A protein has these predicted regions:
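Generic alpha-helical secondary structure signal
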Residues: 41-45, 52, 181, 185, ...
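Hydrophobic, aromatic-lined core segments that form the binding pocket/scaffold
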Residues: 195-390
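Conserved aromatic-histidine-acidic binding/catalytic patches
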Residues: 97-101, 119, 175, 193, ...
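N-terminal cysteine/histidine-rich coordination modules
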Residues: 1-92, 96-106, 110-155
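Iron-sulfur-associated redox domains of electron-transfer enzymes in respiratory
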Residues: 111, 119-122, 136-150, 177-184, ...
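Generic alpha-helix detector with strongest preference for long hydrophobic helices that associate
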Residues: 3, 12-13, 28, 32, ...
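Short, mixed-charge, low-aromatic patches
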Residues: 1-9, 160-164, 297-304
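Charged, amphipathic alpha-helical linkers/stalks
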Residues: 133-229
Length: 390
């Protein structure tokens, strides 16, 4: 990989990305603690060939990745015994950045928490919720999340494109991705329809995807186009076209609580904040018994009060992860993962409230979303929970 040239392009972004900036030492968490950190080929070669201060700093602290030919995963940092990047100083700031400059960071470190996709030749940029500043910028706005187009300069070789979709290549095929834009707009509109609770919106979304898959299996593409057109023209009357009573309502069962409090789960968690959080929950020996006696409905008022946070989080996930096309052609699996992610966040907030009387507040919701997201994004510990219909 050679150094790229600086280009100009239009980027489609959630509006919060326009003002997002890393707050560095003012951040309550550190980006790279607890994670495997990959090094792209360009940066790896720079480390290998440097003769000066950079070489002195990095020697013995990185390795070539012998298991991957991917230029973005060409090498990786040698994580310390306490699961931290070897370049984090005592103030949890990056030594490479501080002593040698941002230009000597790997693409992962330079670009985090930004996510880049290309949809029909349009660049898209959004933010990962494992970053507390992204959570604050994106989710605490009580207005509906909006999307804008801006022009930006960028080095094509210094960004990692997560997903590329060319919906026009599938026109007149049997693949639902040909309707990508209609499905995406409708999905976001459903999640932003405040006439329904968050659980109802997720159920409507699941029913919508179920309808699409059923019609696709019948090869009834005229009906699919008719459904998309009707919903697009009458977005406020969504339930006239989608009967969400046909899907199991989104709810949290006692079995779900049992699973997410399992000690085996705790032992596999990587993120420091989540590990401490779950460890504290597991100290309460009576927590599960207390759940059975607790009137969970009494918390609905608080969850409804802060529903805009969950709405913005879910809309961001839909946009960032290209939902429902992030699991191949299995729309049902995609929506189940989104629902289970929401259930995880809500369940841990409920458990926290019962265990230590911590209130359901903006601050605590953001804490759980950010802490949980570090493991959801960078480890497989929650994979079974996300992919099963629990």
């Amino acid at each position: 990989m050679k150094d790229g040239v600086v280009l100009k392009a239009n980027f489609f972004i959630p509006q919060y990305m326009k003002t997002f900036k890393c707050i560095g030492p003012n951040c309550i968490d550190t980006c790279c603690a607890g994670w495997d950190i990959n090094i792209d080929e360009n940066t790896f070669n720079k480390y290998e060939n440097d003769k000066g201060k950079l070489k002195e700093l990095i020697t013995g602290k990185y390795l070539k990745n012998s298991e991957s030919d991917d230029s973005f995963n060409y090498g990786f940092m040698k994580i310390t015994e306490d699961s931290k990047c070897p370049f984090l100083n005592k103030n949890l700031l990056c030594e490479i950045h501080g002593k040698c400059g941002e230009e000597n960071l790997s693409i992962t470190c330079r670009r985090y928490p930004r996510v880049f996709n290309i949809i029909d030749n349009i660049y898209e940029k959004s933010g990962l919720p494992s970053c507390e500043e992204i959570c604050s910028k994106a989710f605490l706005n009580k207005e509906k999340m909006e999307f804008i187009e801006i022009e930006e300069e960028f080095d094509e070789d210094s960004i990692e494109i997560r997903r590329v979709i060319d919906s026009e290549a599938f026109i007149d095929s049997d693949n639902l991705i040909q309707y990508f834009w209609d499905i995406r707009v409708i999905s976001i509109n459903i999640m932003q329809n405040r006439n329904f609770s968050i659980e109802e919106r997720l159920s409507i979304l699941k029913a919508f995807y179920k309808n699409l898959e059923s019609l696709k299996n019948e090869e009834n593409f005229y009906a699919i186009e008719d459904l998309l057109e009707q919903i697009t023209e009458n977005p406020s009357n969504i339930t006239e076209f989608i009967d969400y009573s046909t899907v199991v309502p989104v709810s949290i069962t006692t079995n779900f609580f049992n699973i997410i409090l399992d000690e085996n789960l705790l032992s596999k968690v990587i993120g420091t904040r989540l590990k401490i959080f779950l460890s504290d929950l597991n100290k309460d020996q009576n927590l599960l018994n207390n759940i059975y006696e607790y009137h969970l409905k009494s918390l609905d008022t608080y969850f409804n009060q802060y529903s805009y946070i969950f709405e913005n989080y879910l809309v961001n996930q839909i946009f960032k992860d290209i939902i429902p096309f992030n699991t191949g052609e299995d729309l049902n699996q995609s929506i189940n993962q989104l629902i289970n992610t929401y259930k995880l966040i809500k369940s841990y907030l409920i458990l926290w409230n019962i265990s230590s009387q911590n209130e359901i507040s903006e601050k605590n919701i953001i804490y759980v979303i950010q802490a949980l997201s570090k493991d959801l994004e960078h480890s497989k510990v929650f994979k079974d929970i996300l992919t099963h219909n629990l």
